[in-house]
């Protein structure tokens, strides 16, 4: 059949149609003639089984099988390249669709792309019987031996004959021009009816009460003449290739002649039948034996000697299949069947390439049905012909040498596969494209490999890539196998099988998948979108060939069927033949090289919750059969049977089951209960880390779930859900009382601050408070000099008494008892930092920036929180050296030069009070040290700290006196004192800044001191004025970090 592609002038992509759409006539290319011939070829093969009896007149109407076999028809659309001759040859009979599902839109969209407008379709008189097209789907698919359909059956070789090919090429375009103008839309729609006879054949063949499934693969994928899909073996590219040479040649001589004659005959009477013939509603039982040919030139069938071939018993054959085969030989009336709507095709199903469930249900699920209607669903064991008839497949049977047939797969991109129709590959962008190449005999490799019923158009480039891969794979396969195919018969068979490189996984699914489908009762969907295709190695093919002659097919080793690439394209448009080869090549490159199968993503699902309903009645699901019944420890452990007559007995409170699974990983809710109630000496094991995986996903008896139940035999058990009713479960409601009594209740909160009445109105009191806060920021207080917050708290506790507040602040013992709510309260900035700690802090900040964890590791004597607090306390008073170094807090100022180089940066809220200019200016370091020391005292509140604080205070007092005595020499004195002192205490000079403002104020005096140090050598007065003016100016502005202005 290796026909060269007919180049078409118009490269317009064909629109795929669904439903009742009727395409414009110009978009309905006439189909090629090869499919019809292939149909007849297979028909003859099948008729060989039946015998010549009971020929049916061409005018007898035939009713199609139910929609179950129709689902595959709706995707069949001829590519634009198909010639009118093929379309004409397939105008077998006009038949009425019995079901609305098979009506116009769903009808075979083959030739015209549209459906048949009639609600039912019947064969028209004068037209060839529809069974001729159906036979291509029948037993030639399954029952033939590995290499041969049946020894006694001759197969017409019209499509393989060179002259016929030439005539086809010459006549195609002319017929196209001749036919198109006179074809109305309805006729063009009915051009697709050649597949209706296919359905009608099975409908007539099947016994009553059988629902025949669609011929799943070939119908939707189109007719491929020379391909055979053998369930039991790799299909040879030419059906006659495996025939015994003598009989093949003898029977094929008249076939070739008649087919050549028919090719030359004009095909136009078919359309006259469409126009004039009334449709006959009557339906008659038909025997699909040999019959005289109709106007389409099926007369060549009559010349074939079609001896009935008995089916030898095969142990591997399903009894239903054997019975079906026996029944096929007897004529049976075709009965209309209940319409079974087909489920919508899904992409996943299409990847798996399984039959539509309804199609399989037609044969498998209905009681009266047998395997005849279900041919595609069963793996047919090979029917062994008489041993004498078996011979090597004759390569020259069709007049083509084996090498020539193989070479026809390869040349100039016009042949996609031995079937010679590269157009099919464009039609099937997915694996069906490959399958169409490789599916073998039943000529119709489900023509619409990709769902052709979509209206959306895909880019030509996408299809070009896919189909190029497909053709490439076929060519590579044939080339590789041609080298091995010159030897023995097995090698030759392997060549024939591997030329279909993609294999016929659809025809030969693994045993596991077949059993799963049959057992589940769910009929697999066959979706001509993307079918997994397996690659066939020549060695496997040879082995399979050897097995097939013994009646054992490759099903014996299903594990070797490795699926190849699955192309999940759902939509495809026909592409001119020029692009087809490149696309097929690219696609087959994938198929050859990488058998990667795209796996759908599996979404993680939560572990199943397994909680028993009742003790003893819990039956673990079979999937989790190794999980033992579990009694929740939180549910009521009561056995009602133990207390049958006790009316006073009360059930314990019912605790609902846990939300989480008892076998989840971790200790869970039951660990404590197990430990507490366990009478076993050793505590039961906790649920292992991966318990939920091992327990819930394995069925091995080795995995033992943790023993969570520790209740003995005598433990009463009651886990019946119930509502806890009774006085035990009621809340105690106090008696109603007068609301006025609430005022007398002591408040449970601690009163921290409450301003007295005349504070806002009395200016004198406000001035006193301000003075107190100013003093709190000075070094006169041994403790708490760093923060105004402490002063305010003391003032509150003293009920506004300023003198009492000063006394509290001057005390060297803890301000509050240990049980006071503020006893452990930390006042910001009250930490005491030694000079060494400050140096380390500045060093750490310079190295690690604000990574206080590393800074704390460097200091080691302060916590991370204290480091953070120190940083933000002095952040706004950082001293920036001329080299850009930042200095936080007071460091060793013994180096006069470094002190002069520092520039003070004052915080905007800090204030220096003119009332106490000298202390602030002359002894800033002491003031800083003092506040910190004082703050540390209240925070620690320890008596042991008092001596240390006292020493510090004495030292600082001495320093202050000396500095005040000689103001001009204060800088030197300060430096000496600072170097001598180990502890520096932060001091805040801010009077109005609450909270951390005190700490910031303490920084300010420090900075003021630095300035004074720098300015004192010149004049004390100059430094005072500079400091005050700078402080007042910067009070409400952000200072410049470089110049301090």
UniProtKB/Swiss-Prot annotation:
Residue list for modification Phosphothreonine:
655, 704, 715
- Give the compositionally biased regions (Low complexity): 240-264
- What residue spans carry the Basic and acidic residues bias annotation? 412-425, 549-563, 894-909, 919-942
Domain ELM2, residue spans: 721-813
Comp. bias intervals (Polar residues): 132-146, 970-980
- Subcellular location, record wording: Nucleus
What cystine linkages occur within this chain?
A: none
GO BP annotation list: negative regulation of DNA-templated transcription; regulation of transcription by RNA polymerase II
PROSITE patterns listed in its UniProt record: ELM2, SANT
Specify the cross-link site (Glycyl lysine isopeptide (Lys-Gly) (interchain with G-Cter in SUMO1)).
Answer: 590
Q: Output the SMART domains linked to this UniProt entry.
A: ELM2, SANT
Q: Give the UniProt entry's GO cellular component terms.
A: histone deacetylase complex; nucleoplasm; transcription regulator complex
List each copy of the SANT domain by range: 828-879
Q: Which residues does the annotated region (Disordered) include?
A: 1-68, 99-159, 228-264, 276-305, 330-349, 378-397, 410-441, 543-563, 887-1045
Q: Where is the composition biased (Acidic residues)?
A: 943-957
> PANTHER family from the entry?
MITOTIC DEACETYLASE-ASSOCIATED SANT DOMAIN PROTEIN, REST COREPRESSOR COREST PROTEIN-RELATED
What does the annotation say about its assembly with partners? Answer: Interacts with DNTTIP1. Identified in a histone deacetylase complex that contains DNTTIP1, HDAC1 and MIDEAS; this complex assembles into a tetramer that contains four copies of each protein chain.
Q: What is this protein called?
A: Mitotic deacetylase-associated SANT domain protein
| Organism lineage string | Eukaryota, Metazoa, Chordata, Craniata, Vertebrata
């Amino acid at each position: 059949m290796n026909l060269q592609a007919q180049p078409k002038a118009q490269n317009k992509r064909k629109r795929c149609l669904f439903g009742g759409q009727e395409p414009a006539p110009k978009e309905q290319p006439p189909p090629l003639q090869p499919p019809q011939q292939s149909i007849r070829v297979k028909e003859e093969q099948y008729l060989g089984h039946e015998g010549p009896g009971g020929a049916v007149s061409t005018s007898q109407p035939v009713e199609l099988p139910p929609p179950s076999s129709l689902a595959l028809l709706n995707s069949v659309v001829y590519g634009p390249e198909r010639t009118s001759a093929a379309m004409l040859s397939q105008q077998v009979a006009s038949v009425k669709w019995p079901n609305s599902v098979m009506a116009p839109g769903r009808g075979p969209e083959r030739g015209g792309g549209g459906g048949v407008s009639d609600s039912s379709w019947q064969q028209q008189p004068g037209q060839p019987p529809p069974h001729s097209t159906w036979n291509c789907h029948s037993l030639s698919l399954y029952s033939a031996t590995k290499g041969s359909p049946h020894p006694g059956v001759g197969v017409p070789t019209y499509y393989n004959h060179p002259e016929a090919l030439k005539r086809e090429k010459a006549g195609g375009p002319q017929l196209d021009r001749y036919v198109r103008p006179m074809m109305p839309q309805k006729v063009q729609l009915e051009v697709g009816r050649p597949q209706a006879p296919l359905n009608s054949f099975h409908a007539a063949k099947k016994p009553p009460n059988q629902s025949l499934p669609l011929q799943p693969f070939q119908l939707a994928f189109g007719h491929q003449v020379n391909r055979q899909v053998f369930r039991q073996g790799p299909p040879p590219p030419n059906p006659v290739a495996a025939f015994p040479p003598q009989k093949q040649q003898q029977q094929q001589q008249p076939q070739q002649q008649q087919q050549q004659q028919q090719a030359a005959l004009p095909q136009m009477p078919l359309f006259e039948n469409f126009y004039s013939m009334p449709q006959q509603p009557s339906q008659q039982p038909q025997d699909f034996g040999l019959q005289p040919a109709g106007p389409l030139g099926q007369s060549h069938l009559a010349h074939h000697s079609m001896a009935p071939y008995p089916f030898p018993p095969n142990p591997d054959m399903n009894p239903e299949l054997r019975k079906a085969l026996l029944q096929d030989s007897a004529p049976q009336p075709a009965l209309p069947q209940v319409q079974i709507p087909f489920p919508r095709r899904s992409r996943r199903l299409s990847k798996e390439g399984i039959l539509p469930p309804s199609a399989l249900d037609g044969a498998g699920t209905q009681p009266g049905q047998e395997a005849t209607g279900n041919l595609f669903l069963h793996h047919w064991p090979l029917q062994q012909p008489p041993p004498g008839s078996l011979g090597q497949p004759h390569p020259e049977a069709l007049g083509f040498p084996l090498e020539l047939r193989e070479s026809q797969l390869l040349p100039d991109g016009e042949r996609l596969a031995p079937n010679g129709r590269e157009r099919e590959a464009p039609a099937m962008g997915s694996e069906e494209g490959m399958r169409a190449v490789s599916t073998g005999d039943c000529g119709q490799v489900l023509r619409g490999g990709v769902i052709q019923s979509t209206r959306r158009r895909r880019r030509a480039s996408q299809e070009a890539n896919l189909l190029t891969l497909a053709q490439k794979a076929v060519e590579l396969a044939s080339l590789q196998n041609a080298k091995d195919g010159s030897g023995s018969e097995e090698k030759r068979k392997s060549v024939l099988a591997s030329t279909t490189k993609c294999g016929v996984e659809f025809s030969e699914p693994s045993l596991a998948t077949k059993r799963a489908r049959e057992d589940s009762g769910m009929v697999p969907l066959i979706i001509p979108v993307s079918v997994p295709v397996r690659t066939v190695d020549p060695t496997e093919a040879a082995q399979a060939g050897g097995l097939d002659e013994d009646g054992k097919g490759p099903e014996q080793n299903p594990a070797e069927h490795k699926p190849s690439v699955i192309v999940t394209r759902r939509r495809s448009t026909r592409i001119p033949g020029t692009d087809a080869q490149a696309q097929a090549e690219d696609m087959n490159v994938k198929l050859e090289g990488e058998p990667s199968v795209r796996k759908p993503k599996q979404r993680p699902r939560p572990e199943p919750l397994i909680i028993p309903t009742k003790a003893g009645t819990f039956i673990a699901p079979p999937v989790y059969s190794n999980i033992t019944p579990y009694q929740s420890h939180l549910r009521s452990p009561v056995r009602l049977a133990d207390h049958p007559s006790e009316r006073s007995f009360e059930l314990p409170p019912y605790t609902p089951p846990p939300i989480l699974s008892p076998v989840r990983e971790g200790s869970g809710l039951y660990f404590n209960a197990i430990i507490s109630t366990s009478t076993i000496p050793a505590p039961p094991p906790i649920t292992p880390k991966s318990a939920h995986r091992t327990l819930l996903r394995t069925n091995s008896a080795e995995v033992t779930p943790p023993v969570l139940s520790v209740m003995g035999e005598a433990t009463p058990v009651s886990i019946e859900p119930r509502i806890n009713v009774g006085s035990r479960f009621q809340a105690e409601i106090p008696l109603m009382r007068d609301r006025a009594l609430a005022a007398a209740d002591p408040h449970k909160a601690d009163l921290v601050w409450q301003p007295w009445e005349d504070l806002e109105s009395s200016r004198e009191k406000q001035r006193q408070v301000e003075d107190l806060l100013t003093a709190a920021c000075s070094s006169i207080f041994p403790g708490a000099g760093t923060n105004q917050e402490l002063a305010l708290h003391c003032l509150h506790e003293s009920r506004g008494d300023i003198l009492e507040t000063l006394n509290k602040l001057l005390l060297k013992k803890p301000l509050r008892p240990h049980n006071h709510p503020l006893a452990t309260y930390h006042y910001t900035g009250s930490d005491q930092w030694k000079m060494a700690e400050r140096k380390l802090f500045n060093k750490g900040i310079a190295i690690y920036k604000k990574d206080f964890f590393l800074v704390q590791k460097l200091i080691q004597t302060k916590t991370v929180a204290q480091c953070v607090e120190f940083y933000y306390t002095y952040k706004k008073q950082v001293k920036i050296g001329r080299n850009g170094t930042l200095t936080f807090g007071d460091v060793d100022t013994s180096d006069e030069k470094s002190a002069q180089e520092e520039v003070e940066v004052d915080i905007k809220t800090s204030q220096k009070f003119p009332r106490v200019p000298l202390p602030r200016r002359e002894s800033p370091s002491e003031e800083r040290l003092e506040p910190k020391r004082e703050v540390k005292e209240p925070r620690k509140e320890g008596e042991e700290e008092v001596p240390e604080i006292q020493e510090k205070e004495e030292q600082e007092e001495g320093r202050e006196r000396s500095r005040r005595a000689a103001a001009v020499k204060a800088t030197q004195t300060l430096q000496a004192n600072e170097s001598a002192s180990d502890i520096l205490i932060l001091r805040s000079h801010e009077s109005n800044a609450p909270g951390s403002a005190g700490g910031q104020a303490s920084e300010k005096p420090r900075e003021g001191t630095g300035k004074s140090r720098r300015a004192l050598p010149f004049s004390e007065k100059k430094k005072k004025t500079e400091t005050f003016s700078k402080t007042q100016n910067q009070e409400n502005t952000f200072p410049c970090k470089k110049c301090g202005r």
